[in-house]
Each structure stands twice: as structure tokens, then as C-alpha cells.
Amino acid sequence: MYLHLHPQNPQPRNIATITETLSSGGVIIYPTDTIYGLGCDIHQHKAIEKVCRIKNIDPRKAQLSFVCYDFSDMSRYVKTMPTPVYRMLRNHLPGPYTFILPASKEVPKLLKSKKDTVGLRIPDNLIARSIVKELGRPILSASLPGEMVEEYTDPEIIYENFGKLVDIVVNGGIGGMVPSTVIDCTGPTAVLVREGAGKWEYEEGTF
């Protein structure tokens, strides 16, 4: 299925169609504030495995992240969040960042790293957040497979390449070419893991 959604005013009917698909174990491709990504309900084990098959990766080694609606939503999946970390996140989210944080018991085992951490996002994208809000649960955030990122900015090309592998491709306009900036907040300091779309000028210091 190929669905058009208005970036600033996503149609509720189409959002409902997407969330119904996710609830039944479906996989989608959807826009974020960076690149288009693969997504599914984080509590649908088989859907996560399907995403990993599409990407040709081992689910237990994938270090997948997921999208939350807001800070209240995010806090359920974080074991501990010291005040300095919370303030730092508030200064950068919603935005093009993935923060690695200590995982709570609410995080499905398949999405936890060996260090019991998880990557979390609150993208500055109304479509992605509307899907999460309507679903009532976070959705997976995984990059599309392959090296040609520039081919994955146009949802029509994405549909041609991946339409048969997923249940829905969401057209939310032309996407970006640069993934999110990844910051590890599990140690005594914030560590830049991957430089991406989000500017990172935070002075590293102890939390």
C-alpha cells in the first residue's frame, strides 16, 4: 500500500490505517526528520524480525532504536535519567538525534543491547509522532538497507524498491539524506557515537 500524508496535517484516516497495520504485525516505511526508515510496533516480535530480514542483519546484534511520542513516553523506557541528562535531552528533542540510554524493563528484550541500553528518538516530524501517538506505543526506527542513501529520499523510488517487502510505504514528502546524530548517555559523559543531521556542540562533562 502507498499512502500520501500531509507533512503538517497528517490525515487521521490514513494514520488510523497505518496504526491498524502496525497493531496486526505489519511493517511500514515512514518519514522522520532525517531519512526515511523502516518501522513496526516494538512489541511485535515477528515484525522486528522481518525488519531485520529486510536489512539482512541479526536482530540480537542490530542495536535498533525506536521512536517515542514525547518525554513522558520516553521515560517509560529509560531505567534512570539524571537531571543533567534530562536537561540535555530537553535541549535537543524533538530533533534529529538518537540518544543511547539505560533500558528499563519496558523495553522488549530483542531491542536491548548486551549492555542493557537502548537508542531512543523523538523526531521533529509530525507524521512519525502522530503514528506513535495514535498507536499508543513506540515504533521501530531502522534505516533502509543499501549504500545509495540518495535513492531513498524520494518515496516513489522507495516504493518501487521496497513496496513488495513491506505493508505500507508512507509518502510524507522528500526525505533527508543524512541520518540522526547518535549520542551515548550511558557513561559519566555524553559521547558522540555518530555525527549526523543534528549539530552537536555540547561540552562533554560529567553528568
Each predicted region: which residue ranges?
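Active-site-adjacent structural elements in enzyme catalytic cores
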Residues: M1-F207
